Amino acid sequence: MKAAQNEAWQARFVAVISNQPDAKGLDFARQNGIPAVVVNHRDFASRDAFDEALAKTIDSFSPDLIALAGFMRVLTDPFIDRYQGRMINIHPSLLPDFPGLHTHERALEAGVKKHGASVHFVTRVVDEGPIICQGEVPVLPGDDVDTLAARVLKMEHRIYPLAVKWFINGRLHLEGSQVQISPPESQYIVQA
């Protein structure tokens, strides 16, 4: 959201919706006149009921794109199908390496020399959607989970706005399971 403000994008954020009442993004939205809505998953008896309420809330704002950030719940297949090709996520690893949780810890344990973040379309399989772009950071001697996570987060803040901007400018599309960016980019991996 900050990148959109700083660069004066030809788009607007129609809402920030979170399942966590204390999410920082909600405060940022409120401070900037963007509707901020909580759909707390704990208020629902089933996952299907939560997903239906979440979808109803999202649909009330008619977004062209849904950009997940810090959303740590697995969505149901019907929910994902509803927004196919219009929902993206950022994941703190160079997918397909280290899907799921604890990515930085796992990268350090594996002894990799580079780590990073991936922006991908959301599909039914967690963290396996078509990759839009990635950002690499080096794993430095002496890194711990916190130092590596901080470096990856900075990269996330570079590549997520890039992918969103491609979408809002009509350059990014999902055709079947293939990411199409037109005109093509010279690079899809951003390096620190």
What residues fall within each predicted segment?
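Short, structured coil segments at secondary-structure junctions
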Residues: N32-G33, Y83
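Donor/substrate-binding cores of folate-linked one-carbon enzymes
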Residues: A3, N19, A69-S182
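N-terminal glycine-rich "phosphate-gripper" loop used for MgATP/nucleotide binding
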Residues: S18-N19, R42-D43, R47-D51, F61-D77
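Conserved acidic residues
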Residues: V14, D64, G85
